[in-house]
UniProtKB/Swiss-Prot annotation:
Listed cofactors: [2Fe-2S] cluster
GN (gene name): petF
Tagged with keyword Lipid biosynthesis: no
Species name: Picosynechococcus sp. (strain ATCC 27264 / PCC 7002 / PR-6) (Agmenellum quadruplicatum)
Record-given protein name: Ferredoxin-1
Cofactor-binding details, from the entry: Binds 1 [2Fe-2S] cluster.
Annotated GO MF terms: 2 iron, 2 sulfur cluster binding; electron transfer activity; metal ion binding
Stated family: Belongs to the 2Fe2S plant-type ferredoxin family.
Amino acid sequence: MATYKVTLITPDGEVSYDAPDDEYILDSAGDAGYDLPASCRAGACSTCAGKIVSGTVDQSEQSFLDDDQIEAGYVLTCIAYPQSDVTIETNKEEELY
């Protein structure tokens, strides 16, 4: 199991923590004490949406985002595993509509 540095740019500021590559970013953020927005926790809505600034994730389990949104860097943190050090802007649900 690899561990990566996850940096979250939230409306309240920037936070970083170490996350395993086999745990969803939403869950590892919660384990690290950071409360991110979430609803379905299954990749089927947009409540937990963020936008990748740098790095890569595996979000192959998601069913909500279209190809254009994924290419633009949007990510559903509830079903995304870090695959490198990654920086994500959180609270991006409004931008999807």
